Amino acid sequence: MCDEDVAALVVDNGSGMCKAGFAGDDAPRAVFPSIVGRPRHQGVMVGMGQKDSYVGDEAQSKRGILTLKYPIEHGIVTNWDDMEKIWHHTFYNELRVAPEEHPVLLTEAPLNPKANREKMTQIMFETFNTPAMYVAIQAVLSLYASGRTTGIVFDSGDGVSHTVPIYEGYALPHAILRLDLAGRDLTDYLMKILTERGYSFTTTAEREIVRDIKEKLCYVALDFEQEMQTAASSSSLEKSYELPDGQVITIGNERFRCPEALFQPSFLGMESAGIHETTYNSIMKCDVDIRKDLYANTVLSGGSTMFPGIADRMQKEVTALAPPTMKIKIIAPPERKYSVWIGGSILASLSTFQQMWISKQEYDESGPSIVHRKCF
C-alpha cells in the first residue's frame, strides 16, 4: 500500500494536547495544546497580519486577547470545524507535510460514537485527500507500546480516564469503564485548595501556572492518613515554587491532596469510584478465565498517571480488592505520557499492518461506513 519512503503520520488527539509525528519515530515531533482561539476584540493596527483564528501554542501565547475553545471534550470531538483547524495546523504548520502524500493513523477514545469515527474518516479523505487512513483505540496503542497484547490499561489524560481490558489485541467493549475525572479536574482542585491557603488563582492564564505546579510538585501518597500526619507535624514535605512575577509560594499537604482525588473522587464532590476500584470493576466485568492475565498486566498510560508514587499506591489498592492469592502487577512505563502515540508509531510501521489501511479507493466505493469494517 504505502512505499517505504513515505512515512505514515501518527496523530493522537487528546482533550488537552495533540501529539503528532511520523511512524517509526520513538517520540512525537509535535506536541501542542488542543485549542483554537478567536480574537475577542477588533484589530486596530492595519498590516499586523492578524488572523481570524489561532491554534495550539500560538493561541496559548495570545490567550489574553482570545476566546479559547477546546474542540475535544472528555476525549471525544464535539466541534468539527475547530477540529479541522487543529488537523490543518498539525499537517501544515507542525509537521510541514502534505497530507495527500501520507497515510494517516488517527486515535480515538474508547466507546467513541460511530458517527464520530465516520466523520473523522470523511474529513481525512474529503478535506485532506489522504491516500489512506486508519483509526485506532488509544488504550490499545498504549498496550502495544508496552509490548503486550493482553492486559488492562488505565489511561488518564487531561479530559477523561478509561479502564480498557484488552485480550489478544481486542478491546472488550462491555467491560470498558469511563471516568470523567482527569488532569483538568485535578488542576481545578489544586487551584481550589491553594486558594484555601491564601493564594488566589482564577484566570485561565493562572490555571496554566497551577498546572505547572501540579506537574512539578504533586505526588501520590502510599498512605494518605499517615502522610497527612507527617505534613502536620513537620515541614519536611514542604516545597517552594516561584511564580512568573518572582513571588515564591510554599505548598505542603496540597502536594499529595491534589492527586489523592484520583483514589477518592469524593474530594471533588463526585460520587464515582476511585481509579483503583474502577480498574477492579472493569476486570470483574470480564470473563473469569482472563482476569488473572489482566491483574498481572495492568498498564498505566497518559499524562495524569505521571505522578510519582501512583504505581505503588495502585498496587496496594488493587491488591486489597483482588482475591488474596492473585498476582498483581502494575506496569508504569517511564514514557507513558506519550505511550498512545508510541503505540501508534509502532503499529503504523509494522509490515503486517500495511494491508489494514483504508485506502482512498475503498472509501470512494463504500463511503465513511468502511471505517467500522476495517477498524475495530
Swiss-Prot record:
Taxonomic lineage of the native organism: Eukaryota, Metazoa, Echinodermata, Eleutherozoa, Asterozoa
Changes after translation: Oxidation of Met-45 and Met-48 by MICALs (MICAL1, MICAL2 or MICAL3) to form methionine sulfoxide promotes actin filament depolymerization. MICAL1 and MICAL2 produce the (R)-S-oxide form. The (R)-S-oxide form is reverted by MSRB1 and MSRB2, which promotes actin repolymerization. Monomethylation at Lys-85 (K85me1) regulates actin-myosin interaction and actomyosin-dependent processes. Demethylation by ALKBH4 is required for maintaining actomyosin dynamics supporting normal cleavage furrow ingression during cytokinesis and cell migration.
Subcellular location(s) of the protein: Cytoplasm, Cytoskeleton
EC number, UniProt record: 3.6.4.-
GO molecular function: ATP binding; hydrolase activity
Residues modified to N-acetylcysteine: 2
Keyword line: Acetylation, ATP-binding, Cytoplasm, Cytoskeleton, Hydrolase, Methylation, Nucleotide-binding, Oxidation
Reaction catalysis annotation: ATP + H2O = ADP + phosphate + H(+)
InterPro entries hit by this protein: Actin, Actin/actin-like_CS, Actin_CS, ATPase_NBD
Primary localisation category: cytoplasm
Name of the protein described by the UniProt record: Actin, cytoplasmic
Modified residues (N6-methyllysine): 85
Organism the protein comes from: Pisaster ochraceus (Ochre sea star)
